[in-house]
Amino acid sequence: MSIHQTPGHVLPARSAAKMEAAMAVGAFAIGTGEFAIMGLMPDIAQNLGLSEPQVGHAISAYALGVMVGAPLLAILGAKLLRKHMLLLLMGLYALGNLATAFTPTFGSLVAFRFISGLPHGAYFGIAAVVASSMVPNDKRAGAV
């Protein structure tokens, strides 16, 4: 199954529901990854020998990544099929978070959190367009 660039390609209800579920799982992962670090700050600070305010810079780095990545990645991926772009964005997000989990230094923590934030905004924007394009016009708001 592929998602066409042309809006309005209505999928059968079952296929649309599966695609929406997959995108919802991706959105849940991004939301969890964004906020989970706040609860882990004391552990991260202790493991890296940092203060909690220093670890707070990793949260800011993620937000900066979201701000930079949303327009940049949406533009760079404009020629790709949206389905492929969503998969690439989730891959980048997963790699950034995996690297964050094993980071040994403060600098790499901040850098990997920035990388993890890059796909966030573009993913939500593209997923909303895909979700609304898979269903009939009267169901678009609910799909998003």
Task: List PLM regions with ranges.
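Cytosolic juxtamembrane N-terminal segment immediately preceding the first transmembrane helix
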Residues: 1-26, 30
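Helix-to-loop junctions at the C-terminal end of transmembrane segments
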Residues: 70-82
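Helix-breaking motifs and short loop linkers at transmembrane-helix boundaries and internal kinks
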Residues: 47-49, 81, 102-108, 119
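Small-residue-rich segments within alpha-helical transmembrane domains of MFS-like 12-TM solute carriers
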Residues: 31, 35, 101, 117-125
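Paired small-residue
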Residues: 92-99, 107-116
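Extracytoplasmic
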Residues: 19-57, 70-73
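Cytoplasmic helix-loop-helix junction between adjacent transmembrane helices
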Residues: 112-144
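Residue-level signature of mid-helix packing/kink "hotspots" within the transmembrane helices
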Residues: 35, 62-71, 121
